Swiss-Prot record:
Gene encoding the protein: AGL9
Any one cellular-component term (Gene Ontology): nucleus
Molecular function terms from GO: DNA-binding transcription factor activity; protein dimerization activity; RNA polymerase II transcription regulatory region sequence-specific DNA binding
PROSITE patterns with a match to the protein in the record: K_BOX, MADS_BOX_1, MADS_BOX_2
Any Pfam family the entry gives: K-box
Annotated ranges, domain K-box: 91-181
Domain of life: Eukaryota
Subcellular location field: Nucleus
Keywords: DNA-binding, Nucleus, Transcription, Transcription regulation
A GO BP annotation: positive regulation of transcription by RNA polymerase II
Function text: Probable transcription factor active in inflorescence development and floral organogenesis.
Domain MADS-box residues, every copy: 3-57
Protein's name in the database: Agamous-like MADS-box protein AGL9 homolog
C-alpha cells in the first residue's frame, strides 16, 4: 500500500514544523552537495529559517564569487565561457589577500580577548609569559606617560606662580611709589601746616613795628636842639614821641 499525497500547506503545530524544517533542510543541503559532485556544477544554496537563522551551501570556495557571477548573468554582459589567465590570476590574488586579512583579523581579535583576560585556557605557558610581558610593557608605558603629564602640569603651575609673584612684586613697588610721591613733591608740608598761624602772626607784628619805625633823614633836615634830639632817640620811637624830632622848637613855651 503506497503513501498518500501530502497536502502542501503551513504546518500549524510548532514542534512538527521545526522537525519538518530540519529534515527537509538537511535533505536539501545533501541534494545540493550531490548535484555539485556528480555533475561538476557550481551550486549555491541559501536558507533562512523563520527565526532569521542562516544556512548556506556553496560548491565553490566563495559564495560572493558565485553571487557576483549570478548578478553578471542576469544584469550584466554575458560572461565568456573560458576566462583568461589574467582574470584567473587577479581572482586568485584577491582571494589570497582576503584570506590573509581574515586570518590577521582573527588573530587580532584573539589577542584583544587575551589582553582582556578572556579565552586564556587554550594558551600555552610560553604564550602566557609573552602575554604577561606585553601587559607589563603596556603598564610601564602608561605610567611613564602619566608621570610626564603630571610633570608638565607641575611645570606650568610653577611658571604661573613665578609670573604671579613678579606681578605682585611690581604692584607692591608701584603702591609704595604712590605713597612716597606726595612727600617727595612737598617734604615740608607738615611744617608749613604747623607754623602757618605762627608765621602769619609774626608777619603781622613785623609789619606793625615797621610802620612805627623812625624814618632815617638827612642831618640838614633835623631841627631843634641836639640834646632834645638825643633824648628823643634814647627814649626810642613810640606812637607818642615819634614825631618830636620834626616839630619846630618854640622858645616861648620854655
Amino acid at each position: 500500500m503506497g503513501r498518500g499525497r501530502v497536502e502542501l500547506k503551513r504546518i500549524e503545530n510548532k514542534i512538527n514544523r521545526q522537525v519538518t524544517f530540519a529534515k527537509r533542510r538537511n535533505g536539501l543541503l545533501k541534494k545540493a552537495y550531490e548535484l555539485s559532485v556528480l555533475c561538476d556544477a557550481e551550486v549555491a544554496l541559501i536558507i533562512f529559517s523563520n527565526r532569521g537563522k542562516l544556512y548556506e551551501f556553496c560548491s565553490s570556495s566563495s559564495m560572493i564569487r558565485t553571487l557576483e557571477r549570478y548578478q553578471k548573468c542576469n544584469y550584466g554582459p554575458p560572461e565568456p565561457n573560458v576566462p583568461s589567465r589574467e582574470a584567473l590570476a587577479v581572482e586568485l590574488s584577491s582571494q589570497q589577500e582576503y584570506l590573509k586579512l581574515k586570518e590577521r583579523y582573527d588573530a587580532l581579535q584573539r589577542t584583544q580577548r587575551n589582553l582582556l583576560g578572556e579565552d586564556l585556557g587554550p594558551l600555552s605557558t610560553k604564550e602566557l609569559e609573552l602575554l604577561e610581558r606585553q601587559l607589563d610593557s603596556s603598564l610601564k608605558q602608561i605610567r611613564a606617560l602619566r608621570t610626564q603629564f603630571m610633570l608638565d602640569q607641575l611645570n606650568d603651575l610653577q611658571s604661573k606662580e613665578r609670573m604671579l609673584n613678579e606681578t605682585n612684586k611690581t604692584l607692591r613697588l608701584r603702591l609704595a611709589d604712590g605713597y612716597q610721591m606726595p612727600l617727595q613733591l612737598n617734604p615740608n608740608q607738615e611744617d608749613h601746616h604747623v607754623d602757618y598761624g605762627r608765621h602769619d602772626q609774626q608777619q603781622q607784628q613785623n609789619s606793625h613795628h615797621a610802620f612805627f619805625q623812625p624814618l632815617e633823614c638827612e642831618p640838614i633836615l633835623q631841627m631843634g636842639y641836639q640834646g632834645q634830639q638825643d633824648h628823643g632817640m634814647e627814649a626810642g620811637p613810640s606812637e607818642n614821641n615819634y614825631m618830636l624830632g620834626w616839630l619846630p622848637y618854640d622858645t616861648n613855651s620854655i
